[in-house]
Design a protein with these regions (language model features):
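Short amphipathic alpha-helix that is part of the acyltransferase structural core
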Residues: 1-27, 42, 134-136, 140
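Conserved beta-hairpin
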Residues: 32-45, 139
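A generic "binding-loop/recognition-motif" signal
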Residues: 10, 54, 98-99
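Conserved acetyl-CoA-binding loop-helix of GNAT-fold acetyltransferases
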Residues: 63, 69-82, 94
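Conserved active-site alpha-helix within GNAT-family acetyltransferase domains
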Residues: 97-125
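Conserved beta-strand in the GNAT
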Residues: 42-50, 55-62
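C-terminal "cap" of GNAT-fold acetyltransferases
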Residues: 116-140
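Conserved GNAT acetyl-CoA-binding A-motif
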Residues: 82-98
Length: 140
């Protein structure tokens, strides 16, 4: 699967897909975010990283509706994790209300939100966009 960094002008397509999947899209243009387009013959979906340093948020993972159910989500996340490692990321953090079991199967473990690094805990994902009931998972 190929990953390409999105240009700011391409964020509208990502926002549309996130909105269609009932996922947060309000902060896509804020600083400190990298979003990628993933393709395997054609567009599969999107995903992103937020923050700087060794701890970052894995976020905005969305697979196009007509590409779901073919194992592409697993490949997309693995490819995004490699993009993170290439940027010096040691630990990925995420919040989810619907896909905790999917991420657990990929090696993410449940964690206490209160133990999140300050930079992660201060993100809009943590403070405003995701509900307190969202599962918090981490992968080192």
């Amino acid at each position: 699967m190929a990953a390409a960094l999105l240009d700011p002008g391409e964020l509208a397509g990502l926002a549309w897909c996130l909105d269609a999947a009932n996922l947060p899209s309000a902060d896509l243009a804020d600083p400190g975010r990298l979003f990628f387009r993933f393709e395997a013959d054609s567009l599969v979906g999107y995903g992103g990283l937020e923050g700087e340093g060794a701890d970052r948020l894995l976020r905005s993972i969305v697979i196009l509706a007509d590409r779901r159910g073919h194992g592409l989500g697993r490949t997309l996340v693995t490819t995004l994790e490699q993009q993170a490692r290439n940027r010096g990321v040691e630990r990925l953090h995420l919040l989810t209300t619907t896909a905790a079991s999917f991420f657990r199967a990929l090696g993410y473990t449940d964690a206490d939100r209160g133990a999140a690094p300050q930079a992660v805990a201060a993100s809009r994902e943590f403070t405003a966009l995701c509900p307190a009931s969202a599962a918090y998972l981490v992968k080192a």
